[in-house]
């Protein structure tokens, strides 16, 4: 029996999240979130060659920063780091729901079905606009331990992943907004420049 309990304990340890972080906001987050107009948001990120403690530390700092801003997703370029890393937690108010870390994420396929939904961004505070995106996607990535993963995502998760991967490619969600009048209005109201928006080709 002792051996069985030891194995159960070992298995339980394996299931623990590799990155543990409180979801409570902190007064001084470890990272600065760059805003629309900064070149950091327009520079494509580089692939991560080695997943090590430094990458896990970055992911943890990104999560702390994200939670402190009450966001559900954050990409490394948003904090001025050009690495293909993003973190997501759709249940940021639930302390028992673990966040997800995506390293070198790539969309393998997208659905022909699309939908329109309002998006916001920690790098463009106060601006909320409709964006058309595929309803579901298939994704490949590595987790925080460097293990290769694949997943199917739909709904809000699919949208959030696409939004954050755009950041890895130097694209902001406002680049994909088609309602020009509302775009100009909200940018102006929140002290952003229309000239900082680059119309996306897809």
Curated annotation (Swiss-Prot):
What is the main EC category here? Answer: hydrolase
Annotated spans, Disordered? 1-24
Reactions catalysed, semicolon-separated, are: N-terminal N-formyl-L-methionyl-[peptide] + H2O = N-terminal L-methionyl-[peptide] + formate
Per UniProt, the cofactor note for this protein states: Binds 1 Fe(2+) ion.
Pfam families hit by this protein: Pep_deformylase
List, in alphabetical order, the GO biological process terms annotated in this UniProt record.
co-translational protein modification; translation
The Gene Ontology terms for molecular function here are:
metal ion binding; peptide deformylase activity
Binding positions (Fe cation): 121, 163, 167
Q: Which UniProt keywords apply?
A: Hydrolase, Iron, Metal-binding, Protein biosynthesis
Name the catalytic site residues: 164
> EC annotation?
3.5.1.88
Entry cofactors: Fe(2+)
Q: Looking at the record's lineage, which domain of life comes first? A: Bacteria
> What PANTHER family has UniProt attached to this entry?
PEPTIDE DEFORMYLASE (PTHR10458:SF22)
Check the record and name the HAMAP family matching this protein: Pep_deformylase
Function (record text):
Removes the formyl group from the N-terminal Met of newly synthesized proteins. Requires at least a dipeptide for an efficient rate of reaction. N-terminal L-methionine is a prerequisite for activity but the enzyme has broad specificity at other positions.
Q: Which family does it belong to?
A: Belongs to the polypeptide deformylase family.
* Name under which the protein is recorded: Peptide deformylase
What is the species of this protein? Prochlorococcus marinus (strain NATL1A)
What's the gene? def
